[in-house]
Amino acid sequence: KITLQDNVTFSSGRAMDAEAVKQCLEHLLANHDRAAADTKIDSMEADGQVLTIHTSEPKPALLNYLGDPYGCIIDVDAGFDDGIVAGTGPYIATDCQSGDHLTLVKNENYWNGTPHIDELTIKTITDGNTLANALLSGEVQAAYGMAYESYPMFENDNFTFSQISTSRCFFLKMNFNEGSVCTDPAVRKAIAMGIDKEGFVENLLEGNGYPANGTFPAGSAFGGDKV
């Protein structure tokens, strides 16, 4: 059972109750194969602000799956043919041009306080050099996903870096099929010990990362000494 926050509305004006969330998830399951495979949701019941979800098999990580970007809760009745959806966040999309930009204005009825910025324009810039030049010239005020080789241009008092460890990682998959040498734990250990993770971070990532000992970063609830 999931109990939803009271007094939350979509930007369309519709109340975000269990029925609205149920409708959104039903649409998701019908149109997104990975979501259906991940969650194994079999049925749902809506009662006021309480949504009861039944799965076809035990799914202890269900909430984590629903936290995936595909699990964003929107007002399905409001439509999305123009690329704009009605959500419950601090900003409302007013213009969406795929591959070019997204314009957002602050949601005056946001349930968790008043946003500090009146309007945002998020631009799509796929070329790394173009992105770096846009930030240097002041064409954009912030950039995400900057190429590592561009970092030195911004290592001064005019710019601030914001970084955080995430579960996005580079990893090696081993073949566990019958007959594979990787079914031997000693072989797997030897392969793992032979990977220079520190060298990978320093040379391939130019120091912008850290050697991982699992899927989750040390600072997370499931990382480091916590497991």
Task: Please report, for each region that a protein language model flagged, where it lies by residue.
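Alpha-helical secondary-structure segments
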Residues: 17-23, 49-50, 90, 117-119, ...
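Structural transition elements
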Residues: 211-227
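Periplasmic-binding protein-like
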Residues: 160-175, 219-220
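Ligand-site clamp/hinge motif
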Residues: 109-153
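Gly/Pro-rich hinge or "lid" segments in bacterial periplasmic/extracellular proteins
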Residues: 61-115, 119, 129
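Ligand-binding "clamshell"
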Residues: 38-39, 152-163
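Surface-exposed binding/hinge segments that line
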Residues: 3, 35-77, 97
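Aromatic- and charge-enriched surface segment that lines or borders ligand/interaction sites
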Residues: 1-32, 181-183
